[in-house]
């Protein structure tokens, strides 16, 4: 019985000693993060899609902050993210990267043909924002509110039942260009 208590005490002391060493090392060798990188990373949509040319949102945020990379390369975030980053960095907003377009292209979402879905879950594993729901050997569906249109779920699908489709424009989602609407100013007469 004494041998068991000695072993328990020895393991506890070793755990305490190694914990103290690790605690000291974590404070002694801590690396300070750039607060600007943290703020940019919080603004980005965290879809980790790679459409900006970087493997994820964090590396893109680091190159924006440290190397002066363009702020207009995040396709899933679109114009809203670019404007927030421009405001944070006090730089001029830039047109979205890609083909020159006056308006932002329509938002795309993944759509699954549920009749052909075999429930392999490969699309669920590929989705960086967990916008696809379903179970093994059961049909899957996409929650369009969460889908960023990053296209990462299309290629892994063995039955090719996933496609990207534009979101239907409604009066709420339409981007009204109010500068093109002709306005006539009518003078108002004041009577005393």
From Swiss-Prot:
[4Fe-4S] cluster 1 binds at residues 49, 52, 57, 74. This is Ion-translocating oxidoreductase complex subunit B. Residues 32-91 form the 4Fe-4S domain. [4Fe-4S] cluster 3 binds at residues 127, 147, 150, 153. GO terms for molecular function: 4 iron, 4 sulfur cluster binding; electron transfer activity; metal ion binding. Binds 3 [4Fe-4S] clusters. Its cofactor is [4Fe-4S] cluster. [4Fe-4S] cluster 2 binds at residues 117, 120, 123, 157. It comes from Escherichia coli O6:K15:H31 (strain 536 / UPEC). The gene is rsxB. Its EC number is 7.-.-.-. Part of a membrane-bound complex that couples electron transfer with translocation of ions across the membrane. Required to maintain the reduced state of SoxR. PANTHER family: ION-TRANSLOCATING OXIDOREDUCTASE COMPLEX SUBUNIT B. Belongs to the 4Fe4S bacterial-type ferredoxin family. RnfB subfamily. HAMAP family: RsxB_RnfB. InterPro entries: 4Fe-4S_dom (IPR007202), 4Fe4S_Fe-S-bd (IPR017896), 4Fe4S_Fe_S_CS (IPR017900), 4Fe4S_Ferredoxin_RnfB (IPR050395), Elect_transpt_cplx_RnfB/RsxB (IPR010207), RnfB/RsxB_Proteobac (IPR016463). The complex is composed of six subunits: RsxA, RsxB, RsxC, RsxD, RsxE and RsxG. It is found in: Cell inner membrane. GO terms for biological process: electron transport chain. GO terms for cellular component: plasma membrane. Pfam families: Fer4_21, FeS.
């Amino acid at each position: 019985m004494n041998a068991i208590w000695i072993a328990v005490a020895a393991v506890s002391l070793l755990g305490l000693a190694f914990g103290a060493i690790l605690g000291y090392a974590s404070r002694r060798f801590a690396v300070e993060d750039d607060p600007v990188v943290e703020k940019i990373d919080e603004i980005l949509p965290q879809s980790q899609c790679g459409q900006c040319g970087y493997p994820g949102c964090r590396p893109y945020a680091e190159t924006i902050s440290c190397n002066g990379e363009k702020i207009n390369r995040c396709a899933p975030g679109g114009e809203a993210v670019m404007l927030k980053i421009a405001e944070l960095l006090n730089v001029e907003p830039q047109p979205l990267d890609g083909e020159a377009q006056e308006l932002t292209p329509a938002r795309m979402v993944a759509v699954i043909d549920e009749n052909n879905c075999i429930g392999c879950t490969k699309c669920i594993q590929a989705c960086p924002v967990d916008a696809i729901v379903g179970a093994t050997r059961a049909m899957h569906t996409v929650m369009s509110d969460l889908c960023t249109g990053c296209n990462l779920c299309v290629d892994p699908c063995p039955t090719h039942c996933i496609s990207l489709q534009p979101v239907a424009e409604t009066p709420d989602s339409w981007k009204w260009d109010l500068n093109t609407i002709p306005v006539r100013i009518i003078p108002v007469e004041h009577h005393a």
